[in-house]
Amino acid sequence: MILHGSILRTLGAGLVLASSVLLVTSVDAASPPASVVKTLNLSLPGPFNGCTVLDSGATPTTNAILDLLRPSAFLTTTNDNLAGEGGAIASAELVSLSPETVVYTIASGQHWSDGASFSGIDLVSWWLRAKQLASIQSDGYRDIRSLAETNAGLTVTATFSQPYAEWNLLFRDVEAIGTPAGCSWSSFLARPSLGPYDLVSATDNRFVLVANKDWTLDPGRFGRIVISDSSTIPASPSAYFASYSLDVTSATVEAVSAHPSVSSHIGTSSENAEITFAPSRPLTKVLALREALSLILDRQSIINDIYGSVTFSPAVAQSSLYSQGQAAYPGGNGSAPSAQSTTTTVPSTQQTGSLNDCALCAVNLFEKFDYIKMPSGWFSATGARLSLAVAVGPTALDQAVAVQVETQWRNDGIAVTSLNVRSDDLAAYKAASNEVDVAIFTRPTTTTASSSARSFAGPGYLDSYPSGVRSGALTELYTTSVSIFNPVTAQGTWLKLDQDVMNEFWVRPLFTAPSLVEWSTAIGQVYGSFSVPGLVDQVTGWGIVQPTSQG
């Protein structure tokens, strides 16, 4: 079951250490002797790359693997919140709101794998690198006015020039000072590590990690991890195996069912399938026509055709910022509760003047703008065919969604030409820059709505999944939300921005993709997760379940 909760805004060293002690105790009690090195085979979505988290090519899988190899102030929990790691960065505490001030404490005696000391200078170097990027990764870092080292580099004080409530997103997967950026394997292998694991080898589809003997947290963790992009379950029932996948089909579920030594969990993911419209194309710049193109689609039918109604049927999306299953998601769980693996579908309703799918409403809107339905399709009063140019993202999910959407549009008399692009953010850019009318892609959500909302406020960097849409109202909502430190209060403002974007039909959210987590029944303390980092960040707390004696 996926749990919910609010983002942790502060980190107390005592609390983190207490949590770590409790976790270690429970793992140790069920773990084999320390002299026995246990290997975990971990399957994650690939292909892999050698990026740092600040590089544009970084993926959720990249970030998750780096969580095991680099110092972080906060990591992702199973319920999509953030919690302090309590490792090399021992604590991070918000000590003042005016001006916003955060104090980072570095654990003493920490060294990178090349022997160099880890200290506050590494955080300063990371800040200087991050704040200059033309990327949303620079958000927050650009708001830091100064970063001061004290206590022989073991204390770093960040003073902000303006409020930034998402400060717990900063200083994650920090690289050593002077290390090269970029995604090449040569650059990656040249960077030292500092975390619960050290790197042995890395390729496009395989990582090998070994436990860092100097890492004192989680002593019962696996001694070796082999990470691959193969979802094949090991033939040996004694092998320790876990995986995270977005490939949720009848075939994959049946395959898991055939392995009694493997447990599984079907839940929601952090991947939202969506349609976005170009802001200045002749057709899509008109609100009523964006609305018609949105309402004419039967989203539940799209879901049913992709996933069927037996294994898992996601509910029609009710948010452009949140994934279904996140605590702040505005809709109900619908037909996709995170705690069960089989669901029933919910038919779409047809209500005029709402966000619900409504083919009749769409027809009325087209006719209101003098479009005429002919046997060969829709035509304007001047005889121009109603046609759309569509950019489609590269993933299997993108392609499956595009087939369904384009088929429905064609069946409704709308001509469609399709262009496949190399990345999801590039698909968004194609629509934002008015090269196409529509983009169909999958947008990842994170622990905060600010990442999704960046499409509509601030610099339109490529990795913001740019929309090309800017307005004073949306910018004000974004600026207000990101400066509110109370997560409950901030949520209300984020939801207002969310609703405004959907009411203007700049985005037509379709659904949140399901995810499948699998693991050997011999592994204890495994929980379902919304995201790849949410699963991988659990790994250090997993232990081996000892068989119970009978009799």
Question: Can you say where each PLM-predicted feature lies in the sequence?
Answer:
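A bilobed periplasmic-binding-protein/Venus flytrap-type ligand-binding module shared by bacterial periplasmic
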Residues: 210-213, 231, 267-292, 296, ...
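Aromatic- and charge-enriched surface segment that lines or borders ligand/interaction sites
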Residues: 91-135, 153-157, 283-285
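Ligand-site clamp/hinge motif
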Residues: 205, 212-257, 270, 415-417
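Detector for C-terminal structural segments
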Residues: 211, 297-342, 358-367, 396-407, ...
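Gly/Pro-rich hinge or "lid" segments in bacterial periplasmic/extracellular proteins
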Residues: 169-224, 359
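Surface-exposed binding/hinge segments that line
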Residues: 103-105, 136-183, 200-201
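Ligand/substrate-recognition segments at binding pockets and active sites
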Residues: 204, 345, 349-355, 369-442
